[in-house]
Each structure stands twice: as C-alpha cells, then as structure tokens.
A protein has these predicted regions:
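C-terminal substrate-binding subdomain of Rossmann-fold SDR/epimerase-dehydratase oxidoreductases
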Residues: 19-25, 32-40, 60, 71-74, ...
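N-terminal Rossmann-like NAD(P)+-binding domain of SDR-like oxidoreductases, especially those catalyzing
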Residues: 1-196, 238, 244, 248, ...
Length: 350
C-alpha cells in the first residue's frame, strides 16, 4: 500500500508538532516547512529524534519519515517549488501570525501571511492542475465569530473583532471559493482555542501557568493580566490535530467547528491553575483594581493592567462540535482540568 505524503506549513508550531507526531505514527512521509530566521525554533520537534542522531526514533515512529524544508508563505517561488517537488497527497496550512493583539501592530504582515498566503497556496494547486490529487486543510479560527452569541457553530454569523480575525476570515472565504469554483478538495477547520505544554509564553494560558509556578517558587512576584472575564472554549492541541486529520480522510471537503462545547473565564482558568499548583488565593476589588492575594503570605500576586486588554474585546466564545461528532466521529478527550494538569507537567519537565 502506497504511503501518503503530507506537507505541513507551520510545522514547528504547537499544532504542527503534534500533527507531525500523529502522521508519523500513521506511517506518513511527512514534509515540514519552517521559516528561515536568525534563530529558528525547532525545539517542539526535538523529541522526535534520537539524542545522538538526526534520525527519527525508530521504536516510536515505525516507518514514518520526516524531512524539514525552508519556505515562507510570503515567498511564492518557495511554495511552488515545495509543492512541485514533493507532490503531496495532503497539505496542512497551520502557518500564521497567530497572536491577536499583535496583529493590530503589524496589520499588513498579518494580512499577507494569514490571508494572501492561503490564496497563493490554492492558486498554485489550481495552476498545477492538481485539484483532484491534493487535499488542502486550512486552520481557521473561532476568532472569526467575534461577539456573535455562543454557542457558535458552522451556521453562526462571523463578526471579526481584530486584524487577525479579519485575515482568517479572508482565508476561510478563499478556501470556500476555490472549492466551489474550481473543485479543489479544500476544507476549513474552525478551531476554538486549544493549548498544550508546547504553547508559547505569549499566550495567556501558558503565561498564567508559567507565572504562577514561578510565584510559587519565589522566582516571580506578580502576574499581570487583562480582561479576567473573557470566556473561551479551551481544548487540547492533541485532540484538535486528530480532528484535522479526520477531516482530510473524508471523500468530500467540508468546513467543521472543532471545540469542546464548554467555556470558562480567564479568572476561572487562574483559579483552577492555582488549585492544582497548591496556591491559595483571594480576589479583592473590581475592574482595573481587581487583585488576587496569596493567602499564605498576604501578598498581591495578580493584578489587572489596561495595556493587556484588546483594542476590541471578544467576550465569549463557545463552540458546538455536533457536526464534527456526526461527520468525522470526533469528540475531545481532554477536559479543562486535564489540560491544565498537562501544561503544568510540561513546565516541570522543562
């Protein structure tokens, strides 16, 4: 039986690394794409290799193979070369400027990477006349829903509240257009927030857990946060990459919401993280004056700062994965407590 070939853009990110894990276990020939930078970060892939070798760990990854390439969604020639040379069966586009707040500081870059980059990939597939030979997956975002009332599903109205969300909505619509106009197998996975030990420190969940651990160990005095009452549907990246793969195994392309059907606030995330870390806190004050006090020493360890609020807040995101459960037989395995526990364990490993 012929082994499938997958090409992954954004291979060194949180989702890319977990997707590589999954595909290698499924005996894929995997090609990952990373941007060339002054200090490229491939640490999320270190576990794939034997300590004293560049070869994959054979006992864990069977016959799967991984080759990394340099490329960039802003460089059309590199995209064209990769697709022509590799001839992939599946393309997963997980690459993005993914930080919502930063997107307003670099709007043109965000739009080019998140939006125009997707257009370039689909146009290359079409121009090579590989519409029937390549399956394309686009990582869409729940941020596209903005302040549309939850629960949000495939029929909910989009109402983007950031440059990031606007760029993602452009890409979402481009995928639909190329699918309907040219017959490409192009699917959108509308992913709600998903975290893991491999999440970077500039995302609020990792920021919270890392700071609280440091505070407990007297390595940090305070944690500063923005909107404590922003509610999100948080899942585990491991679950979500499985959904990506399942979407690509369908006979026809589709757009699906991937979520947990539940939500908690940033404040509740803090409370559960404190509970698991053994930090007893008490909240006092309101608004920008709200604070958390460590009951063991009466010191203020959490404060609210206006600079961490978004330009336009998205108050409540909660997905409905009913369609995904029906179409691809998917549901999340991790609950929020298990997710937080895994993230804390990941810090301990570090």
């Amino acid at each position: 039986m012929r082994r499938k070939k997958a090409l992954i853009f954004g291979a060194t990110g949180q989702d890319g690394s977990y997707l590589i894990d999954l595909l290698l276990k499924k005996n894929y020939i995997v090609h990952g794409v990373k941007r060339r930078g002054s200090s490229p970060n491939t640490s999320r892939l270190d576990h794939l290799y034997s300590k004293d070798s560049s070869r994959l760990r054979p006992n864990f990854y069977s016959k799967g193979s991984l080759t990394m390439h340099y490329g960039d969604l802003l460089d059309n020639s590199s995209l064209h070369r990769l697709i022509v040379d590799i001839k992939p069966d599946e393309i997963y586009n997980l690459a993005a400027q993914s930080h919502v707040k930063i997107s307003s500081e670099i709007p043109e870059y965000t739009a080019n990477v998140n939006g125009i980059g997707v257009l370039k990939l689909l146009e290359i597939i079409k121009s090579l006349k590989r519409e029937k030979k390549i399956k394309f997956y686009q990582a869409s975002s729940s941020e596209m829903f903005g302040n549309t009332l939850p629960p949000q599903n495939e029929n909910s109205e989009f109402n983007p509240q950031s440059i990031y969300a606007i760029s993602k909505l452009f890409a979402y619509n481009v995928v639909k257009y190329y699918r309907e106009a040219y017959g490409l197998f192009a699917s959108n996975g509308i992913l709600f927030n998903h975290e893991s030990p491999r999440r970077t420190y500039n995302f609020v969940t990792k920021k919270i857990i890392n700071a609280l651990k440091n505070i407990k160990e007297d390595k940090q005095k305070k944690l500063f946060l923005g909107n404590l009452y922003s509610k999100r549907d948080w899942g585990h990246a491991k679950d979500y990459v499985e959904a990506m793969w399942k979407i690509m195994q369908l006979k026809s392309p589709i757009d699906l919401v991937i979520s947990t059907n539940s939500q908690i606030s940033v404040k509740q995330f803090v409370n559960e993280s404190c509970r698991q870390l053994g930090i007893r806190i008490k909240w006092v004050g309101k608004g920008l004056n709200e604070k958390a006090i460590n009951l063991d020493n009466n010191k203020i360890i959490i404060e609210v700062k206006k600079k961490y609020f978004r330009d336009k807040e998205v108050n409540s995101l909660c997905g409905d994965f009913t369609k995904a459960k029906k179409i691809i037989n998917w549901k999340p395995k991790y609950k929020i407590r298990e997710l937080i526990s895994d993230m804390i364990s990941g810090l301990n490993i570090d």
